[in-house]
Curated annotation (Swiss-Prot):
Residues 46-50 are annotated as: G2. The gene is infB. It comes from the Archaea. GO terms for cellular component: cytoplasm. It comes from Ignicoccus hospitalis (strain KIN4/I / DSM 18386 / JCM 14125). GTP binds at residues 21-28, 86-90, 140-143. Function in general translation initiation by promoting the binding of the formylmethionine-tRNA to ribosomes. Seems to function along with eIF-2. GO terms for molecular function: GTP binding; GTPase activity; translation initiation factor activity. This is Probable translation initiation factor IF-2. InterPro entries: EFTU-type (IPR029459), P-loop_NTPase (IPR027417), Small_GTP-bd (IPR005225), T_Tr_GTP-bd_dom (IPR000795), TF_aIF-2_arc (IPR004544), TIF_IF2 (IPR015760), TIF_IF2_dom3 (IPR023115), TIF_IF2_dom3_sf (IPR036925).
Length: 609
């Protein structure tokens, strides 16, 4: 709301609405359609322009939803309208942050009916959950349902009634699929016209952003929800403005500016403001408040026009000195008295520091382009049990590589850098390559985490494989009568593997637990083999002070001599790596060993448990 006198100001502000969803599911088309509707139904001079947002005024909502009055009861609107954030997607949504939640009051989750839930849909739902933002599902592209006949700009319910039984069934099945996906994520949902309680169920509105079908219901559901359940949150506040930076931009003739969404109160030209910056709070004075020049402006060169004041909810460009280090996703507060300045500086500092993590613990290094995306990324990692040592805004620097090296020296798994939508500085890249520090870079959060998790899984498998190769596996063999090829130095005998596994270098013991050398080589049909398993008959050479006929005899049963520490690992960390017959042989080995050492293979509880 821009430049309104006190009498003109309504009692409620417009709800701020964000649009999220998977790539190519129709977010931008939907916003374009909504904007186009406003332009078509308003006199050009009456359109209030915002920076980074589009206002759909109440009179436009009423005109669009007029045909619905014949079908469903509609609410008398007290809201001044709906303020849509122009840039869709969860990167911008992440920046619409405030302490303990989001600046957005409502969200539209756009889902392509024909494709259903996709990776970024799940990511969007997770962010909406994190920020506790109520949302409506726009089930888009109904015009793509085979056999659908389009009725441009009509309410969905009118179009739906004109479709064949078969087409309606196809649509309903697609909606049930979306309901199923939402149920898996813990949400009860239903088609909007079948909902009895909007606080308990998520409304699914079938639409076509292309033809405009269903847009009347979508606007009606959003406005109705906001008015019915959010009046407390939307109360108009006269006090000093609170806002959030969506983008920091260099503008010719103005220098560094911040595109800001004001969600509370009023901001005026000349006000002192405190802004969140990378290096701490920035205190500055508003030189100008800019909004886009009206579309009717004759001189096309004039992109912005100044206004004296702006009140919530609004999108505005703030021009002020010293904004170069301001960071998107950080708060903007108007200082209404000198006494409040220190308090607000402290508040801004706290808010930024809550997101910019710096600890000594082992964990990954996270870099992102804005405070909002950093916060979302850290939350995603925490939800997946991945610890974070440091989280900062900005490019990957040499210092980040040094931090990762410190972590890597203690824990290979987390000595890495996750970089979202930021560059890696040349000297950082050089050091990372030299020190073998892995940098994951992506501009889609879920892909960034996915790539890291895939790498981590492969690393853990490789580490596990290396450890497993050093462990002696349980094995049991019998010396075959009549198959003694050499009695000693080394003894060579034919054996049958009765259970488990034998490999070269494995020590052997008798049934009384006494050691009888170790396996030098295994041969099957004259060929050396790396191992032999249960059921195989092979020739083995045994090195050590062992002679067939004196220390061991034909028909003897021998076991692999599993060291006590190895037995503990087989019983705990690697128990799922043993086959059933190996587990059985291990129990026999434990029984033999405990006659000599009662604590063999005993797993003692750790002090912390």
């Amino acid at each position: 709301m821009l430049n309104l006198s006190a009498e003109q100001r309504p009692r409620l502000r417009q709800p701020i609405v964000a649009v999220l969803g998977h790539v190519d599911h129709g977010k931008t088309t939907l916003l374009d359609k909504i904007r186009g509707t406003v332009v078509a139904l308003k006199e050009p001079g009456q359109i209030t322009q915002h920076i980074g947002a589009s206002l759909v005024p109440t009179d436009v909502i009423e005109k669009v939803t007029e045909p619905l009055k014949k079908i469903i009861p509609t609410v008398k609107l007290e809201l001044p309208g709906l303020l849509f954030i122009d840039t869709p997607g969860h990167e911008i949504f992440s920046n619409l942050r405030r302490r303990g939640g989001a600046v957005a009051d409502l969200a539209i989750l756009v889902v392509d009916l024909n494709e259903g839930f996709q990776p970024q849909t799940y990511e969007a739902v997770e962010i909406l959950k994190q920020r506790r933002v109520p949302f409506v599902v726009a089930a888009n592209k109904i015009d793509r349902i085979p056999g659908w006949r389009s009725y441009p700009d009509q309410p969905f319910l009118i179009s739906y009634r004109k479709q064949s039984e078969e087409v309606r069934e196809r649509l309903d099945n697609k909606i049930y699929e979306i309901m199923g996906e939402l149920a898996k994520l813990g949400f009860d949902s239903e088609r909007f016209d079948r909902i009895t309680n909007f606080t308990r169920q998520i409304a699914i509105v079938p639409i076509s952003a292309k033809t405009g079908e269903g847009i009347p219901e979508l606007l009606a559901v959003l406005a109705g929800l906001a008015q019915r359940y959010m009046k407390g949150r939307l109360k108009y506040v006269e006090g000093p403005a609170k806002g959030v930076i969506m983008e920091v931009k260099e503008e010719p003739g103005y220098g560094s500016t911040i595109d800001t969404i004001i969600y509370d109160g009023i901001i005026r030209q000349g006000d002192t403001i405190v802004v969140g910056g990378i290096e701490g709070p920035i205190v500055t004075k508003v030189r100008a408040l800019l909004v886009p020049a009206p579309l009717t402006e004759m001189r096309a060169t004039k992109r912005f026009e100044p206004v004296e004041e702006v009140s919530a909810a609004a999108g505005v460009k703030i021009v002020a000195p010293g904004l170069e280090k301001a960071v998107a996703g950080a708060p903007v507060y108007v200082v209404d008295s000198p006494e409040k300045l220190e308090e607000l500086k402290e508040q801004v500092k706290r808010e930024v520091e809550e997101v910019m993590i710096e600890t000594d613990k082992e964990g990954v290094i996270v870099k992102a382009d804005t405070l909002g995306t950093l916060e979302a990324l850290v939350q995603f990692l925490k939800n997946r049990g991945i610890p974070v040592r440091m989280a900062r805004v900005g490019p990957v620097t040499k210092r980040d590589i040094v931090e990762a090296m410190t972590v890597k020296s203690k824990n290979k798994e987390y000595g890495v850098i996750l970089a979202f939508n930021v560059k890696v500085l040349p000297e950082a890249k050089e050091l990372a390559e030299k020190e073998g520090i892995k940098i994951f870079q992506h501009n889609v959060i879920y892909r960034l985490i996915e790539e890291f998790e895939e790498w981590l899984k492969a690393l853990r498998e490789e580490e596990k494989r290396k450890v497993l190769e050093t462990l002696v596996r349980p094995g049991k063999i019998r010396i075959l009568p009549g198959f003694v090829f050499r009695r000693s130095d080394p003894a060579i005998v034919g054996v049958e593997v009765l259970g488990g596994v034998i490999k070269p270098k494995y020590p052997l013991m008798k049934e009384d637990g006494s050691r009888v050398g170790s396996i030098l080589q295994i041969q099957d049909k004259g060929q050396s083999v790396p191992e032999a398993r249960a059921g195989q008959q092979v020739a083995i050479s045994i090195k050590g002070r062992v002679m067939v006929g004196r220390h061991i005899h034909e028909g003897d049963v021998l076991y692999t001599d599993v060291p006590a520490e190895h037995a503990k690992l087989w019983l705990t960390k690697f128990k799922n790596e043993l086959s059933d017959d190996e587990k059985f042989v291990l129990q026999e080995i434990i029984k033999i060993k405990r006659k000599q050492n009662p604590l063999y293979g005993v797993v003692l509880p750790s002090p912390s448990s």
